[in-house]
Amino acid sequence: MLAALLINILFIHSVHNAKILLASMPQGRSHTGSFMPLINKMKEQGHEISLYMEAYPDETNFGLKDRMLKIVNHTNPFATEEFESFQWKHDFVVTSQMFPFFYGSTSCDIVLREHRNFFNQMVNEHFDLILTDTLFAVCAYGFTALNKARANHVLMSSTHVESATGAMRAHGINFVLRPRQFMPVQDVEFKPELFHYRVTGTFEWIANFIISGFIVNERMKYSLAPVVPSFSFFEYQRTASSTFTDMPSDLIGPFPRTNDLFEYGAYCPTPKPLTGELLDFVSDPQSKGTILVAFGTVINWGRVPRKKFDAILDTLNSLTDYRIVWAYNGHPLNTKPHIFASSWIPQVDVLFDNRTVLFFSHGGLKSVKEATCSSTPAVFMPMFAEQVRNGWMAKDKGYAEVFSKHILTAENLRKTMKLVLENKSFSKNAARIANLFNDKVVHPLVQGAHYMNRLLRYGGRMPEYF
């Protein structure tokens, strides 16, 4: 009896003090930020969580134990002028997905060539569970596959489960009947009753599987060859114990799934009241409201093509009836007094301020969710990845418009922004969706942490019922 009691005490202690590693893509501030609400909930419950990321050379560790690999004398493979130019000139289609994986492989080449000791340290360190980004974290896949403690790994998706991952994991999702990950900006619609949408969905699903399972796999296999003789991305995904996704089905819609796919993303951030200079700025009694302009961590305003930048600047300068808060990291600006530009803006706090009437953004999932939570109508101008689909989710529910960067002129952008600002249906729909989004029996982060803890109770894997 006493022995059984001691075993139970040790078992509970191990669950509540687990060593967990979160391994994100290189310079992956955005992806890590998507994972952090769940990670912080796990920290609150007593778990020790470390963060691995290849940083060029610096990046925040988000308050986690530091396993950051700071790489000097190299530029971030994801921050090339070529990639930044691509974002403004081209659409991100299914074949574009391979290039970020190639960048992740290039980063891993550097790690294994110049930082092999650090890689080996990660191989040999004991963790109870390893959480790896589903995208671009090539070296993390390598040291997880080699981990001496044989820690089980979980796939962490910062968006909806990619169709290749869903197929490799056999999650039971019919991606032909789901909105396409790389929805074209010239057709921001999803009508599965029409043959055209089912055909294009089928093509994208097959293409994504081929690209991830064969083309990308060969590039990653080449990078990891010095340490993993025959790496298989298919096998790595297949053998994961579960998948966690930040995409709420409240936005993308319900879908069938297996019991090892968990979502935790239908949460809202906690805002703080505006203070100081920013509060004084938005409190102008003559203002019709605040417009927030923020395009995430990837867009460098100093490298935006001149004509497109001028179109945005001219549009913002013309909206003199509003106070405009712009998260801006480019060259010095010549703006009118109604524009407040700063390299850092408390985005959540501005969105939740009751004076904010419009959000102009790129349509990253965090931005779409923050617009949803704060009941803020939006104009989304997608730049890359799945951002067209993210914008579609808000457009489909009636509180946003999706604007194409290919028709970016001051006249076109101003017309779209005025439409959302002056049509009250956008704000009414935003308020309605926010109420539905927050109406949960169990808080999604509490539920997500429960499922993560259940994995730990069973040695990092799903319980076996049969």
Language model feature labels by segment:
Residues Q27, T32, P37-Y322, L333-P337, ...:
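Nucleotide-sugar-dependent glycosyltransferase catalytic domains
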Residues I71-N76, S157, G265-A266, H362-G363, ...:
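Short beta->alpha connector loops at strand-helix junctions that form conserved
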Residues L408-S425:
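C-terminal "capping" alpha-helix adjacent to the active site of nucleotide-linked donor transferases
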Residues S14-G28:
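Nucleotide-activated donor-dependent transferases that construct or modify glycoconjugates
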Residues I130-T132, S343-N390:
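A donor-sugar binding/catalytic signature common to diverse glycosyltransferases
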Residues M1-N17:
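Cleavable N-terminal signal peptides of Sec/SRP-targeted secreted and luminal proteins
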Residues I339-F340, A378, D396-K405:
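A short acidic/histidine/glycine-rich donor-binding loop in glycosyltransferase catalytic cores
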